[in-house]
UniProtKB/Swiss-Prot annotation:
Pfam family of the protein (one): Aminotran_1_2
Family: Belongs to the class-I pyridoxal-phosphate-dependent aminotransferase family. LL-diaminopimelate aminotransferase subfamily.
GO molecular-function terms, A-Z: L,L-diaminopimelate aminotransferase activity; pyridoxal phosphate binding
Enzyme class: transferase
Catalytic activity: (2S,6S)-2,6-diaminopimelate + 2-oxoglutarate = (S)-2,3,4,5-tetrahydrodipicolinate + L-glutamate + H2O + H(+)
Protein's UniProt name: LL-diaminopimelate aminotransferase
Keyword vocabulary terms for this entry: Aminotransferase, Pyridoxal phosphate, Transferase
Name of the gene encoding the protein in the UniProt record: dapL
Cofactor: pyridoxal 5'-phosphate
Residues annotated to bind pyridoxal 5'-phosphate: Y73, A109, K110, Y133, N188, Y219, S247, F248, S249, R258, N293
Subunit structure: Homodimer.
Transferase as UniProt keyword: yes
Native organism: Methanobrevibacter smithii (strain ATCC 35061 / DSM 861 / OCM 144 / PS)
E.C. number(s) listed in UniProt: 2.6.1.83
Amino acid sequence: MVVKINENYLKLKSSYLFVEVARREAEFQKNNPDADIIKMGIGDVTKPLAPSVIKAFQGAVDEMGNADTFRGYGPEQGYDFLAEEIIKNDFEPFGVSLDTDEVFISDGAKCDTGNIQEIFDLGNKIAVTDPVYTVYVDTNVMAGRTGEMKDDGMYEGLTYLKCNAENGFVPELPEEDVDIIYLCYPNNPTGTTLTYDQLKVFVDYAIEHKAIILFDAAYECFIREDDVPHTIYEIEGAKNVAIEFRSFSKMAGFTGTRCAYTVVPKEVAGYDSKGNEVQLNQLWNRRQTTKFNGVSYPVQVAAAAVYSDDGKKEIKEIIDYYMENAKVIKSSLEKLGLEVYGGVNSPYIWVKTPNNMDSWAFFDLLLNEANVVGTPGSGFGPSGEGYLRLTAFNTLENTKEAMDRISKLNF
């Protein structure tokens, strides 16, 4: 008698993309201990939490140290005081009304975008953009919705919607019927966006085909242009077909504090084997109350402070700081004659590698010759080959230094 494993895990690539990036970086640092490496790969932030957030955080911790104000287990879905602030500030300004029980507070959009697939049948046909945030793909592989990875880097059973310079990084509708479509805009990794009309095409498809859109809007706060939707629910009919994911990680520096939320409107539904309509809100609530104990009270208080008058001002300054970095990266690389995308409504810059160099070769060149770490585009899918992602989350000083180093390279 032996314990059998979930063999779907064996279908995955040998290591998670960012683990391999970190491994190569660590190996280089070990061999070059004096090298000053500038990290512009993984999307971690460098600015500290805003003062108003810290003040609220500390106040909530003090409450936890007092018997009269101590709080134990909180509601798995999150406290209403935070959900109310989210609705008031993130949705109502765009004409979207929600109830608090449609907002689920969590410890990360990565967790939610990975876990949401649990409420769907394994037989559903999945579509992802290519390149893509790898969590969408890997979690469906783990669940058993795909076959093996083919020689072209694509998994059997997944539908890939190519995004490249030729189509302006706007994915075409799937040629075959699909049940679930993952979209991320502003996009990770390409930094590009969809207009209202372009997003409406997908919403209309989902309505017609009774499909579900899983819409990752983790980078909404970086939107600068007018014709870019801030939430998918600005599109007519989207409440019937879309689940939206948001995060405080990049918006407010919560990468180490952990807080996010998922919106599951009561209108959005799936179907059981008998064809009966089932609210996805109920299923997600059941999943969360079973597997998740909720985000800590101090963290939720800190997140709510993001929406205070002082918090909004402080957060805007931080976001503007990162977007200035993005501007520096984009303009510097364009001056070198490189093709550069993103960086306008997003902290991500998507760079075409010079001289048809492959992604990992360009990664190694920047690491070895400029001591700058990016993320190889091929790690995000076959259509990412020949690109490299840089992030705007380092300091302005380091960002300028990195661009200066790269400008001295001979491509």
